[in-house]
Amino acid sequence: MNMLKKAGIACASVAAILAASAGTASAVSVDEYDDVKYVWCTDSGADVQIENTNAYGGTEDGTFRLSGRIGDGTRSCGWQTFNAGDDVSYVSTWITDEDGGYVYCAIYLDGVLVSQSEDRSSYYSVTGCY
C-alpha cells in the first residue's frame, strides 16, 4: 500500500472514532444512599441561576447569591449535600450567570470528585456537571 493511501485510511479511522464518541454525554450515576454534594462558585456578588437534581430525582432551580467567600474574596462558593433516594439514578447541576464572569460546578459522590466544569465567558456564562 502506498504512503498516501495509508495516511488516508488512518485519517478515516481517527475520524470514525471521533464521530462515534462525539455527542456521548457522560452522566453521574448514583446508587441509593450515595452521599451527593454539589459545589458552585462564581465571582463574588453575582446573582446566578442554579438548577440541579434533588434527592428525589426531581429538578430544583432558583436564583442565588453565593455567600461563602474564598481565597482573596473575589469568588464566592456554596454547596448542597443530600443522600440519594431510591428514585434517583443520575444527578446533574448547572450554574448560569447571565451577566458573564466566572462560574464553576462540581459533583462529589461519597466524598470523591466525579465531575467538575467552569466557564469564564464575558457575556453569558453557563456550565454544567453531569
Each model region followed by its residue ranges:
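Post-signal peptide N-terminal regions of Sec-secreted extracellular proteins
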Residues: V28-Y130
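N-terminal prepro-regions of secreted/extracellular proteins
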Residues: M1-V39
